[in-house]
Amino acid sequence: MAIDGRSSSKPFSRFYLNSFEEGRVTRLEKVSLVGHGPPHEKSYISDATKNKSVWLSEKEPSLPRYQRLVVLRSLFHALLLRPRRSFALLCYSCAAPTRTNSKMCGAQLQIEQTNASSGLVRVIGRWSLVALMVNTMIGASIFGLPAVIAAYLGKWSPTGYFVAFVGISVIAACMAEVASQFQEAGGPYLYARAAFGRLVAIQNGWLLWLARVAAVAGVANLFITYLGEFFPIVKTPLPRAGILAALIGFLAAVNYRGVAGGNRVSNFFTIAKVSLLSFFIVTGFFRLLLHSDLRVTPQSVNATASDWFGALLLMVYAYGGFESALIASGEARDTRQDIPVALFVAIGITTFLYVAVQILVIYTIQNAGTSETPVVDSARRFLAPLGVQIIAAGTLVSAYGYLSANMLHTPRILFAMSRLRDFPAIVGKVHPVFRTPHISILIFAAAVYLFAVAATFRWNAILSGVARLFVYGTVAAALPVLRKKQPTADAFRLPFGWLFCFLGLLFTGALVVRMHRGELIVIALTSAVATLNWLWVRRQQAPSEATN
């Protein structure tokens, strides 16, 4: 039996009722045994109202009562709304032979529709998106930044997080509307391409990818630093390089084999990290309430406007990462409904954790701004030695969880650029077995390893924070442009969108002008490389356009 010009030695019937309201019928692409072998194809019918899918096969076990009702209701709606199309579809499905059952290998089959255009598997749900964003935002920075913020703002440092929360929420609101208009992988790069064209998109893609590579490499450096507290030998050059290779290589291998595997690893580390932080917060506040002698007077600082801007820039770095989870939207189940909810839930959870940790640090440590390990030093004030060791180990879990989240979503930047012909085609290849952008994953892992081995945490952190501000500004500016280009788009609409756009640009612009010359030089060099990439793309496309 031939389907779409491709011969198949195993004939099967495949039909998919997709959106009965519009009467569109779309064939099922491939269903993947994620991480457990090649794609398998079967017939199923989808409920248009609940986006549920059930198998239809002569040799399958009988369907549960709920699924039988789903099938009957779907057929009833189809026959009422599009009787001629539905009749033709049912005739075709009855006439086509059904694929015989074959033994499935290993684990339970995950039934997910792939992205018809890219081949990526849509397995990331709403709460997995929340976990991914929280995991990305709460990296190792939460264990080091409280001291730096306290040095800038003193007793007003918890208030600083609320100010940063307002600014980041404005950016997130703009992203919620813009992101809900896209189903493909790519995140802010894709939004810039639709709004401003190829040149700005390539610039945005390079800056975003560079920001993530530098951030992940910096956290990998911190992981080695914290691990050195337990095993000092890892700080020497050769063991350090070996541990970094094992650290980055393992997560690359997990995500190479399947997005569901990477999704599970990311969720595991998010739960572990938030649980440890919750243990620290609950125990700390409980002890402070019962033992007032543990409390110290917060450090008093006469914060200037420059201090506030410096602290806010670091807080933007601390919140950074929520936008990167949108890069994996090509594998999200429902971008229009899930992304806006996931964004604000994740930012709310992150703000609560940051503020709570900051309060504990400044009220338990004298001169908190001078501490190198503020969370561990704070834990020593109210926890037994075993508890302090648990918190120290939590630092390693937090750092490694941050790496796992970024290894899942950041490779999709180059993947999206390649699929849109803004990068070499080989980067956009999807693995024939695991259905993952394996080339992009390998490139990202190699870049992270090189940055981690060759540079320091400070250099990587500065580079990441500066690049991220430009990405945020581009997304805010894209909101009114996309509204004008797609006035009837089926997307989340932000009330007072123009006001949010203005506030987002004002927030990012105010921080950009506070950057130092060295940071701007790095951004200028990155922009120059992106411009060369754009010129290469134009040169590659010129012959094909002339032929046409």
Predicted regions and their residues:
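Helix-loop-helix junctions that connect adjacent transmembrane segments
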Residues: 115-120, 157-158, 162, 234-242, ...
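Alpha-helical transmembrane segments
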Residues: 423-431, 476-493
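Membrane-interface "cap" regions at the ends of multi-pass membrane proteins
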Residues: 92, 101-156, 162, 168-173, ...
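Select transmembrane alpha-helical segments in multipass membrane proteins
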Residues: 122-133, 197-210, 244-247, 302-315, ...
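TM-loop-TM module centered on a large, flexible mid-protein loop between adjacent transmembrane helices
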Residues: 190-191, 197, 228-233, 342-406, ...
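Membrane-interface loop-to-helix entry segments
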Residues: 238-290, 302-304, 343-347, 464-474, ...
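Hydrophobic transmembrane alpha-helices that form the core helical bundles
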Residues: 148-152, 160, 169-248, 252-256, ...
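A generic transmembrane alpha-helix motif of multi-pass inner-membrane proteins
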Residues: 463, 467, 496-548
